[in-house]
Structures are given as structure tokens and as C-alpha cells.
């Protein structure tokens, strides 16, 4: 493996770690309604588990409500059950094929719990970044040992890997800071 390929692979892995963090943070509830809250909700449909977005359309008519328009009338009770089982703290109100999910205001205590959870997700992402950095540095050692790169080039590339790690680590920090602001805004 050459050094350019290695850098590209490390960057792709770090991008993936950042995307995972972004997905986890979208699942955290802020005070506003967001269809992203329902991304992980699965529904028993047609004999298998399906994502809610595959059996209904989701919308936010206002800042405190999510509407779930179920396409198949026979699925309404399964969708209600899926939302309840997801344990999001939302109570479905059904009106025909339309399910309204009023978003209750977050208590101060719940906000603090969500901030802690966001920080945990951030720390998990940083651990992933450090593991990726370690793998990259091990690969560089192997390249040096096999006389593919010189010792000084190994040192320079290690510094580049560290810079890349620092860059992505600061992206994680800013994502967490932004989410914390969103959660704590009343």
C-alpha cells in the first residue's frame, strides 16, 4: 500500500466516524419537532420489520408536532405500536390514517441527560478516530520496516496522520457544542 492510498483510506474512515456521530446526534431530541427523531423506528409490516419512513410519510406542520401519514390503513396500529416501543417519550394521537405526535417540552433535567448523552456520543467518535490513527501509524511502521518509506518520511506522515486526527477531533467537538446549544435552548 502506498502512502497516498493510506491517507485516503484514513480520511474515508474518519469521515465515516463523523457520519455515525451525526446520525446519533440527529436521534437526540431537542425541544423542536424533527422527523429525524423517527429514523430508528421500525414497524411490523407485511410479515417483516420495516422502517417507519417506508410505510408512511413524515412531516412537521409546526415546531411542536410531527405528523405521520400512514399509507395503508391496515398499518395504523402497527405504526402506533412501533412508535410506542421506540421509547421516544412520544404519545401517538390517531385520526384515521394520520397519527399526530405532539412533542412535549423538555424538562431541565432531561435536557442535561441529553447533553450527557451527546458528550458520550462525541467521546465514542473520538475513540474511533484514535483507533483509526493507531491503525494508520501501525501501517506506516510496517511500510518503514519493509523499506518502502524512509524513517524521516515515516515521521512526516505520522505528523500528517496526527493533523488529520486533530482536524476531525475538532469537527466532533464543534458538532457536540452545536447539539448542546440546540438542546439547552428553551
From Swiss-Prot:
<dbReference type="InterPro" id="IPR002661">
    <property type="entry name" value="Ribosome_recyc_fac"/>
</dbReference>
<dbReference type="InterPro" id="IPR036191">
    <property type="entry name" value="RRF_sf"/>
</dbReference>
<dbReference type="GO" id="GO:0002184">
    <property type="term" value="P:cytoplasmic translational termination"/>
</dbReference>
<comment type="function">
    <text>Responsible for the release of ribosomes from messenger RNA at the termination of protein biosynthesis. May increase the efficiency of translation by recycling ribosomes from one round of translation to another.</text>
</comment>
<dbReference type="InterPro" id="IPR023584">
    <property type="entry name" value="Ribosome_recyc_fac_dom"/>
</dbReference>
<keyword id="KW-0648">Protein biosynthesis</keyword>
<dbReference type="GO" id="GO:0043023">
    <property type="term" value="F:ribosomal large subunit binding"/>
</dbReference>
<dbReference type="Pfam" id="PF01765">
    <property type="entry name" value="RRF"/>
</dbReference>
<comment type="similarity">
    <text>Belongs to the RRF family.</text>
</comment>
<keyword id="KW-0963">Cytoplasm</keyword>
<dbReference type="GO" id="GO:0005829">
    <property type="term" value="C:cytosol"/>
</dbReference>
<protein>
    <recommendedName>
        <fullName>Ribosome-recycling factor</fullName>
    </recommendedName>
</protein>
